[in-house]
Regions:
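Secondary-structure boundary elements
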Residues: 57-66, 94-100, 125-142, 170, ...
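Polyanion-binding loop/helix "lid" in catalytic or ligand-binding cores
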Residues: 46, 174-204
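Active-site beta-strand/loop microenvironment that shapes enzyme catalytic pockets
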Residues: 114-164
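His/Asp/Glu-rich, glycine-adjacent segments
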Residues: 7-111
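Short, small-residue-biased leader/transition segments that mark boundaries at the very start
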Residues: 2-3
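Metal-dependent phosphoesterases centered on the DNase I-like endonuclease/exonuclease/phosphatase
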Residues: 155-182
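Catalytic-loop motifs flanking and including active-site residues across diverse enzymes
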Residues: 51, 123, 160, 189-193
């Protein structure tokens, strides 16, 4: 299912172990990428459910229809992993340390129900307001935000990338929000995760 916006609110989330046999069937580049996202053994991360619920509550108040996901999906082999967008962060940034994480999922890729760039920015603002309110009640906690994904790909568009980076640098994202949605196709759609974070940071 391709849900436009989802917030994971289960008790924990698992980055499942590398499937070595599956990796052997892949091209060298894909095999290398798999090592960068899957740990040698399953790694479990606690989820700050109260923060997730606060983000959902605020999003509903801001007129977003948000899915609350409570369990990781399974198949005949067992638990399905959290995907490379999160697995890469867990491996390369968190270094498999059991830091609490709250996965927020955007369907930037699969038609026909991808949120627009403007909608992603507004959702980011909603997340920012939710975190600010939650932080007021949890002064001993710190929240770090991490987007995942590239800018233009699989065809590289240097002009587009420059416009995006300059918009973030100048804190004037309106030109990017005004880009036609046809610019946010295929892998380039992942730019919307960074646009969401830009919206969040506008509330800090």
């Amino acid at each position: 299912d391709a849900l436009p916006i989802s917030v994971y609110c289960g008790n924990q989330v698992v980055n499942t172990a590398l499937d070595v046999e599956k990796m052997k069937t892949k091209s060298p580049g894909i095999a290398l990428a798999m090592k960068a996202q899957y740990p040698p053994v399953d790694k479990t991360y606690p989820v700050p459910r109260d923060l997730g619920k606060a983000i959902i509550k605020r999003a509903v108040e801001d007129e977003f229809d948000v899915t609350a996901s409570m369990e990781q999906p399974t198949n005949a082999k067992g638990l399905i992993g959290i995907g490379h967008a999160f697995g890469f962060i867990c491996r390369r940034i968190l270094r498999d340390r059991p830091v609490p994480i709250l996965p927020i999922l955007l369907n930037t890729y699969f038609p026909p129900n991808q949120p627009t760039a403007k909608r992603c920015y507004a959702f980011g603002q909603s997340i920012g307001r939710a975190i600010a309110a939650w932080g007021g009640e949890h002064a001993d906690k710190r929240v770090a935000i991490c987007a995942s994904g590239g800018i233009s790909h699989f065809v590289v568009d240097e002009d587009f990338d420059t416009r995006v980076l300059e918009a973030f640098k100048s804190k004037n994202v309106q030109p990017i929000l005004d880009e036609p949605e046809t610019m946010f196709r295929s892998g380039t759609s992942e730019t919307k995760t960074w646009i969401t974070v830009a919206g969040l940071l506008s509330e800090t």
